C-alpha cells in the first residue's frame, strides 16, 4: 500500500482504475466526475481532531464541461460537484489507510454555500479534517470540510460520511 503524502492527477486516475492502492480498494470516479486534480497533503494524525486531514485542489478554466451546461448564459460550477469532491476525498482517505471495498456517500450533517465558482476563477482548494474513523464490519469515515475558490471559503460541510462496503448489492 502506498503511504505517500501527496498525489498527482495520474495517481488519482490510477485510483479510479483500482491501480493505486490495489484492485479491492475504494475507487475515485474517473473522467468528468473526478473533481480533484491533485492532493497536496494527506496524513493520518493531523487536522483539528488529530485523526487525519487532506488538502486537495482542482484547477478551474472556462472550458470545464459543467460551465457549458450550468447555466446557459450564467456559467457556474454546480454546488453538488464541490460536495461530491468532498465525499470523494473521504473515500480516498479510507483507501489510503488500507480499507477495501466500494465507497458510498452516506450523508452529510450540514452544508453551507456562501459563494460560487465562476469560469474566471483559477483554483478550488478542498480542506478536510477527519473527525472519526470506524474500522469494524462497516468501515466509515466522518469529516468536516471547507471548499475555497482562489483563497476565499465558499462552502462548508460538517459530518461528511462515507462508508466502504464489501458488497453493495443490497445497498
UniProtKB/Swiss-Prot annotation:
One of the Pfam families matching this protein, by short name: FabA
InterPro entries: FabA, FabA_FabZ, HotDog_dom_sf
Localization per record: Cytoplasm
Reactions accelerated catalytically: a (3R)-hydroxyacyl-[ACP] = a (2E)-enoyl-[ACP] + H2O; (3R)-hydroxydecanoyl-[ACP] = (2E)-decenoyl-[ACP] + H2O; (2E)-decenoyl-[ACP] = (3Z)-decenoyl-[ACP]
Active site per the UniProt annotation: 70
Molecular-function GO term, any one: (3R)-hydroxyacyl-[acyl-carrier-protein] dehydratase activity
HAMAP family assigned: FabA
UniProt similarity note: Belongs to the thioester dehydratase family. FabA subfamily.
Assembly, per entry: Homodimer.
Name of the protein in question: 3-hydroxydecanoyl-[acyl-carrier-protein] dehydratase
Native species: Shewanella woodyi (strain ATCC 51908 / MS32)
Amino acid at each position: 500500500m502506498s503511504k505517500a503524502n501527496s498525489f498527482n492527477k495520474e495517481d488519482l486516475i490510477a485510483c479510479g482504475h483500482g491501480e493505486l492502492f490495489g484492485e479491492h480498494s475504494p475507487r475515485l470516479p474517473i473522467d468528468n466526475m473526478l473533481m480533484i486534480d491533485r492532493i497536496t497533503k494527506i496524513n493520518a494524525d493531523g487536522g483539528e481532531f488529530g485523526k487525519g486531514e487532506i488538502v486537495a485542489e482542482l484547477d478551474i478554466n472556462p472550458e470545464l464541461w459543467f460551465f457549458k451546461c450550468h447555466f446557459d448564459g450564467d456559467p457556474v460550477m454546480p454546488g453538488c460537484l464541490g460536495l461530491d469532491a468532498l465525499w470523494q476525498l473521504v473515500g480516498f482517505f479510507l483507501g489510503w489507510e488500507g480499507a477495501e471495498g466500494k465507497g458510498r456517500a452516506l450523508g452529510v450533517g450540514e452544508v453551507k454555500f456562501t459563494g460560487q465558482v465562476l469560469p474566471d476563477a483559477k483554483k478550488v482548494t478542498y480542506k478536510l479534517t477527519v473527525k472519526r474513523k470506524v474500522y469494524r464490519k462497516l468501515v466509515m469515515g466522518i469529516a468536516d470540510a471547507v471548499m475555497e475558490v482562489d483563497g476565499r471559503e465558499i462552502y462548508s460541510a460538517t459530518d461528511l460520511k462515507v462508508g466502504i462496503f464489501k458488497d453493495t448489492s443490497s445497498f
